[in-house]
UniProtKB/Swiss-Prot annotation:
This protein's encoding gene: cca
Co-factor binding details: Magnesium is required for nucleotidyltransferase activity. Nickel for phosphatase activity.
Domain-related comment: Comprises two domains: an N-terminal domain containing the nucleotidyltransferase activity and a C-terminal HD domain associated with both phosphodiesterase and phosphatase activities.
Binding site for ATP: G8, R11, R91, R137, R140
PANTHER family assigned to the protein according to its UniProt record, in alphabetical order: MULTIFUNCTIONAL CCA PROTEIN
EC code: 2.7.7.72, 3.1.3.-, 3.1.4.-
Domain HD, first and last residues per copy: 228-333
Further information: A single active site specifically recognizes both ATP and CTP and is responsible for their addition.
HAMAP family registered for this protein in UniProt: CCA_bact_type1 (MF_01261), CCA_bact_type2 (MF_01262)
Binding site for CTP: G8, R11, R91, R137, R140
Subunit structure: Monomer. Can also form homodimers and oligomers.
Protein name: Multifunctional CCA protein
Organism the protein comes from: Actinobacillus pleuropneumoniae serotype 5b (strain L20)
UniProt xrefs under InterPro entries: CCA_bact, HD/PDEase_dom, HD_domain, HDIG_dom, NT_sf, PolA_pol_head_dom, PolyA_RNA-bd, tRNA_CCA-adding_enzyme
Cofactor(s) it depends on: Mg(2+); Ni(2+)
């Protein structure tokens, strides 16, 4: 029985990156042998065992043979005769097919170390095309390692394009697409994930509402980048820069993607203007979120940002009644942190334009100021003044509007 450290741990170690999770491969063993040594078996798809002390994962070496569609359509062989090379060749990329034994010796049968040096994401074998999930994984790795200069090998891009064209991505479940997208949002450059998907044709399959934005022009004075799809990529990039201040970074990134989907529905005869794109965008934002089974809180936040982001841009011009309408829609009285995330999303939109990346966004401070004075209106005082039931809400709104009016002349 031989045990090897494999996968991401070896890759990240060779890149001098922090190693978070360690996965081990066991060659020449049976489940019974591991159980006898105190390992605990977990997982139903294939034998994975937890070390009795460290609780790290140990998997039996295996071979896979395609016998169906999608990423579940495989037969697996876990016999003790499966070699290290046979196990590693079933993996997706060469950089993920490097092993290390207990003495520190590296086993690299498929050129992973050279591809690490060349900053290349390259598939190991044609069997890559048997698992459509690998398309999303490679796009995510491109996002994760973008800052290190990694690119996808041309032959791998070509294979991913062929997989997309033959309809293999249709077998991906919504849950897997959303999970990989969430992981992409957690990288430093999530916009690269979507750029890769667009390059291989997968954006039109998985995110058609987003893909529809590319080629749709915007007024150059407000959007030097002109293209609505390019603008959305820039907004995602800016949202990631701001995400460290967000309560829900995933919701912030998803809202950045969804905020301008209405521009894909603009009539051609009024382009490059997009009158009413905010309200038009609510339906595609909801449909895309529902189709990917996005959680309710993330979906609701994206819809709110879609409908009200331009209100925030015009905060200094809004009537107090409109300011309060936005505040009530956001339910900022009960969810003040979501309000802060909303302001971050609007700031990302304002900065997600060529040459605007470092612009100030004073609208956020103004909105916070309005919120501060409106929140000081005491609901208990309204009740003590004799208002009841619906009249409480109406009077509360009136007093909040008055509070905003008092400070507005000073803006």
């Amino acid at each position: 029985m031989q045990i090897y450290l494999v996968g991401g741990a070896v890759r990240d170690q060779l890149l001098n990156l922090p190693v978070k999770d360690r996965d081990y491969l066991v060659v020449g063993a049976t489940p019974e042998q591991l159980l006898a040594q105190g390992y605990q078996q977990v997982g139903n798809d294939f034998p994975v065992f937890l070390h009795p002390k460290t609780k790290e994962e140990y998997a039996l070496a295996r071979q896979e043979r395609k016998n169906g569609v999608g990423y579940n359509g495989f037969l697996c062989d876990f016999s003790p005769d499966v070699t290290l090379e046979q196990d590693l060749i079933r993996r997706d990329l060469t950089i993920n097919a490097i092993a290390q034994d207990a003495s520190g010796q590296i086993f690299d049968p498929y050129g992973g170390k050279q591809d690490l040096a060349n900053r290349l994401l390259r598939h190991i074998s044609p069997a890559f095309s048997e698992d459509p999930l690998r398309v999303l994984r490679v796009a995510r790795f491109a996002a994760r390692f973008h800052s290190l200069g990694f690119k996808i090998a041309p032959e791998t891009v070509k294979l991913m394009q062929e997989m997309t064209a033959c309809g293999e991505l249709a077998h991906l479940t919504a849950e897997r697409v959303w999970l990989e997208t969430q992981k992409a949002f957690a990288t430093d450059n999530p916009q690269i994930y979507f750029e890769v998907l667009r390059e291989i044709g997968a954006l039109a399959v998985l995110f058609p509402e987003f893909d529809r934005l590319f080629g749709v022009p915007q007024p150059e004075q407000h959007h030097p980048e002109i293209d609505s799809g390019v603008h959305t990529l820039l907004v995602i990039e800016q949202a990631k820069r701001l995400a460290k201040n967000a309560e829900n970074p995933t919701a912030l990134l998803w809202a950045a993607l969804c905020h301008d989907l209405g521009k894909g529905l603009t009539e051609k005869d009024i382009l490059p203007h997009h009158y009413g794109h905010e309200v038009k965008g609510v339906k595609p934002a909801r449909e895309l979120s529902n189709r990917l089974k996005v959680s309710t809180d993330v979906k609701d936040f994206a819809i709110l940002v879609t409908e009200y982001h331009t209100h925030c841009h015009k905060m200094a011009e809004l009537r107090p009644e409109t300011v309060l309408k936005v505040f009530n829609a956001l339910d900022i009285w009960r969810k003040p942190q979501r309000f802060c995330d909303f302001l971050l999303a609007c700031e990302a939109d304002a900065r997600g334009r060529l040459g605007f990346e470092n612009r100030e966004y004073p609208q956020a401070e103004l909105a916070k100021w309005y919120f501060k004075v409106a929140a000081q209106v005491d609901v208990q005082a309204v009740i003590q003044d004799g208002f009841e039931k619906k009249a409480i809400r109406e009077e509360l709104n009136k007093r909040r509007i008055t509070a905003i009016k008092i400070i507005k002349p000073n803006v």
